[in-house]
Design a protein with these regions (language model features):
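A short beta-strand/loop micro-motif in the catalytic core of glycosyltransferases
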Residues: 1-5, 12, 115-117, 163-164
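A nucleotide-sugar donor-handling region in carbohydrate enzymes
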Residues: 2-70, 80-95
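Generic beta-sheet signal
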Residues: 4, 32, 86, 118, ...
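Short, glycine/polar-rich helix-capping loops at beta-to-alpha or helix-loop-helix junctions
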Residues: 7-19, 126-127, 183-191
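Short amphipathic alpha-helical segments
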Residues: 13-14, 97-98, 128-131, 175-178, ...
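Residues at the starts of beta-strands that form the adenosine-phosphate
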Residues: 28, 114-115, 180
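Donor-nucleotide binding loops and adjacent catalytic segments primarily
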Residues: 48-56, 62-69, 78-159
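A donor-sugar binding/catalytic signature common to diverse glycosyltransferases
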Residues: 156-193
Length: 194
């Protein structure tokens, strides 16, 4: 078996899985590292700024994004520090009180620092339902964009100051890119990150 972490190896040992065959000492389990990290680092050089973010920042800075070349756009903006946030898990979105609490906190944080939130379709639908109940959850300080592809997400992670998420994968990617991460869950499957 190929394991991504020492913790995974310890878990298999605790479950009684043999590390080697007793006859010839052939190793059955080995830590090969995390292929998710390999992928993230490989695609980092191919990452691109999401069009919605590029357009937003060009409006803020007065620049015409159509006149900028990709090399300029893909550089980390010096004055455009932001928090990257994603929310999609049922434990956070199915409970109206919890969802409202999360967005109240995000709106408060957004008064001091820009938050970019690629909004999952499921979360968007639930927010729209709450908005129709006259429960305003979104303010102008919170930058909502449509979901982005992997290369755009890699760019957002690489260029942010902080990650806030309930996504298991994004927690790990934040670690790979040496970003602090606030996990918006009661527990995580990635105990190595805590």
């Amino acid at each position: 078996l190929f394991c991504p972490t020492d913790t995974a190896m310890k878990n298999l040992k605790a479950e009684g899985f043999p590390f080697s065959l007793t006859n010839n000492h052939q190793q059955l389990i080995t830590n090969v590292g995390d292929v998710m990290q390999d992928g993230a680092m490989f695609y980092k050089s191919l990452a691109k700024i999401p069009e919605a973010v590029s357009s937003l920042w060009s409006l803020v800075s007065g620049e015409d994004s159509k006149k900028q070349n990709l090399q300029t756009i893909n550089q980390k903006p010096k004055t455009k520090n932001y928090i990257l946030c994603t929310i999609h898990r049922a434990e956070n979105t199915d409970d109206e009180t919890r969802l409202r609490s999360i967005f109240d906190a995000l709106n408060e944080i957004a008064k001091e620092k820009q938050i970019i939130l690629p909004l999952h379709p499921r979360t968007k639908k639930l927010l729209e339902n709450l908005q129709t109940k006259n429960q305003k959850l979104l303010t102008k300080n919170l930058t909502i964009i449509d979901p982005v592809g992997y290369l755009e997400m890699v760019w957002l992670i690489d260029n942010c100051d902080l990650v806030m998420t309930d996504s298991g994968g994004l927690q790990k990617e934040a670690y790979f890119f040496e970003k602090q991460c606030i996990t918006l869950r009661d527990e995580t499957e990635w105990v190595e990150l805590v």
